[in-house]
Every structure is written in C-alpha cells, then in structure tokens.
C-alpha cells in the first residue's frame, strides 16, 4: 500500500479503506474503497461497505457518497480537476508543480485500483466515468 501513496501525503491520510470483492470464480480482489484525510472532511469520491441490521441481503450495503470527484484531465501533462487541487490548500501544502504531480499520482493510483468507480450508485457523472475509462485504456496500451 505504501507504494500507492506519495511521501508528501503519508502523514496526512487518516484511513485507507480496503474492500474485498468476490468475482464470479469466488476469488478475492482487494480494492481501495476510500481515502480519507486526517484534518478535514474531504474524501475521494468513493463508497464504503457498511453492515446493516436488516435481514435482506440487498440492504446489507449502504453507500456513503463523499463530496469530491477528483478527475484526471490529461495523463501526459499531469492535469487534474481544480476541486482536486483544493485538497492541497486544505492540507496546507503549497500549490506547486511537485505537489500537484504527487496529488496526480495519488489520484491516479486510487482510480486505477477502484474497480467499480463508475457504478450507477457511486455518484459519478457519465462524463467523468468516460474520462476515467479513457485513462484506463490509455494506460493499458502503455503497459501492453
């Protein structure tokens, strides 16, 4: 997990919530469900699995939708949405090129690990989901 978080953010993150998903063959896949910062309410757009007292399997999952949707605009030039850059201000980090690149790396690593980021109940718009899907395809081409 340490490799996913740039050093500049390591002492600023209070929690990284991991969820276990079971695929069709019942193999466990660990994904990051949420990254939560220490000294303010901002979290990455995500959801958490939370137990419910209901007996119904459908209602055993409740969604916790958060306020920010940090989106990468341009993979080549480290461009991210201004609402994501606001995270630097709230963490009292300088809004300079290095910190923006490190924030980009954090967001990139986060979005690449979340498998169901564009699910209908997560709260991302189709426009933003399309951007994430294009980035994933572009990265897959680079890796292959």
Swiss-Prot record:
<dbReference type="Pfam" id="PF19231">
    <property type="entry name" value="DUF5884"/>
</dbReference>
<dbReference type="InterPro" id="IPR045365">
    <property type="entry name" value="DUF5884"/>
</dbReference>
<comment type="similarity">
    <text>Belongs to the mimivirus L885/R898 family.</text>
</comment>
<protein>
    <recommendedName>
        <fullName>Uncharacterized protein L885</fullName>
    </recommendedName>
</protein>
């Amino acid at each position: 997990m340490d490799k996913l978080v740039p050093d500049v953010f390591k002492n600023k993150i209070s929690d990284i919530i991991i969820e276990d998903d079971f695929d069709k063959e019942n193999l466990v896949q660990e994904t990051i469900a949420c990254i939560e910062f220490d000294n303010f309410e901002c979290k990455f757009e995500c959801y958490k699995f939370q137990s419910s007292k209901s007996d119904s399997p459908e209602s055993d999952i409740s969604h916790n939708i958060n306020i920010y949707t940090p989106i990468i605009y341009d993979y080549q030039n480290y461009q991210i949405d201004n609402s994501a850059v606001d995270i630097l201000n709230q963490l009292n980090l300088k809004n300079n090129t290095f910190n923006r690149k490190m924030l980009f790396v954090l967001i990139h690593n986060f979005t690449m690990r979340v498998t169901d980021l564009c699910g209908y109940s997560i709260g991302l718009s189709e426009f933003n989901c399309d951007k994430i899907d294009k980035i994933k395809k572009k990265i897959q081409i680079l890796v292959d």
